[in-house]
């Protein structure tokens, strides 16, 4: 049986308009001047044998998930969404109980790396969110490269919360620098069975050509600690510094310590089960 490949993160977004300006507060700048839409993404996926993608609305679109939800409605067998939620807004508390009733919505993706957002992990702003996500069974992806230990504390306090650490807990500031310290912080969370990790966008964190040999032992340590069922491949296409194909063949061809069964879990089955997005043969 062929492996179903799922990209665990791609940002898609629309053009900026006078009535829909990009956000600048607690947000990154667009990764490229021309928006990446679902039609282009489908072409890239088809060219590389990737069946599905988890669409993650980017921070510069604020808290609009519409572009991604439209893609999921048009192609429900190809796209699903981990949407953004304004954790600091009181009105968001009313949204989470019915969050997954939106067609194509699987959970929430949070980012704590820009503006005031990192403070929300420490000042109590985000406390309600972890409680509610656990209570309502909403999986969470979290990008907080400077606060991975804090995410571990949160996961330990909320054992029913399904938490995914984005991009192996790495920061763009580490590109070309030793990554061992950041990986060590991540490995301490492996004992928490409600924590998984996206082994995604990894070429972005090294300053060397394919096949990115510096990454191989680090990926091995993460996979051995979390086990393949809790490691999810992904590209972060719009931010990717390598080709899409290279990001994929890094796992399919270059990591010789991975068995075929390991690849099945890492490349798609793991995230499908974690996010309750049934694979075709399971539907």
Located regions from the model:
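Active-site gating/metal-coordination segments in enzymes
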Residues: 52, 61-146, 153-155, 198-202, ...
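Conserved, mostly hydrophobic/aromatic
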Residues: 9, 45, 68, 108, ...
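Histidine-centered catalytic micro-motifs
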Residues: 5-15, 165-168
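Short hydrophobic/aromatic-enriched beta-strand-loop microsegments
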Residues: 79-82, 162-168, 252, 283
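Catalytic pocket-lining loop regions of alpha/beta-barrel enzymes
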Residues: 119-233, 279-281
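Mid-to-C-terminal alpha-helical segments outside catalytic/metal-binding sites
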Residues: 3-8, 24-52, 221, 226-232, ...
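Active-site gating loops and adjacent loop-to-helix segments of metal-dependent hydrolytic enzymes
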Residues: 13-39, 44-51, 102-111, 161-162, ...
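Catalytic metal-binding/acid-base residues of hydrolase active sites
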Residues: 11, 59, 113, 169, ...
């Amino acid at each position: 049986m062929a492996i179903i490949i799922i990209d665990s993160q791609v940002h898609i977004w629309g053009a900026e308009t006078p009535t829909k300006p990009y956000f600048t507060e607690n947000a990154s700048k667009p990764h490229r001047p021309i928006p990446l839409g679902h039609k282009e993404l489908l072409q890239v996926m088809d060219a590389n044998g990737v069946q599905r993608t988890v669409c993650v609305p980017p921070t510069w679109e604020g808290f609009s998930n519409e572009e991604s939800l439209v893609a999921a409605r048009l192609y429900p067998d190809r796209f699903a969404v981990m949407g953004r939620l304004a954790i600091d807004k009181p009105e968001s508390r009313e949204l989470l109980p019915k969050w997954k009733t939106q067609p194509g919505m699987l959970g929430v993706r949070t980012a704590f790396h820009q503006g005031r957002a990192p403070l929300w992990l420490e000042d109590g702003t985000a406390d309600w969110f972890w409680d509610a996500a656990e209570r309502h069974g909403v999986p969470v992806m979290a990008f907080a490269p400077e606060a991975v230990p804090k995410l571990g504390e949160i996961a330990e306090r909320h054992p029913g919360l399904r938490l995914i650490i984005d991009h192996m807990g790495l920061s763009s500031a580490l590109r070309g620098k030793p990554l061992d310290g950041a990986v060590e912080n991540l490995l301490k969370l492996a004992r928490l069975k409600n924590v998984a990790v996206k082994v995604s966008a990894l070429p972005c964190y090294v300053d060397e050509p394919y096949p990115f040999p510096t990454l191989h032992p680090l990926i091995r340590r993460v996979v051995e600690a979390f086990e393949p069922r809790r490691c999810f491949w992904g590209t972060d296409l719009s931010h990717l510094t390598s080709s899409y194909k290279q990001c994929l063949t890094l796992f399919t061809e270059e990591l010789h310590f991975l068995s075929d069964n390991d690849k099945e879990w890492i490349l798609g089955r793991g995230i499908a089960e974690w996010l309750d997005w049934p694979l075709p043969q399971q539907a």
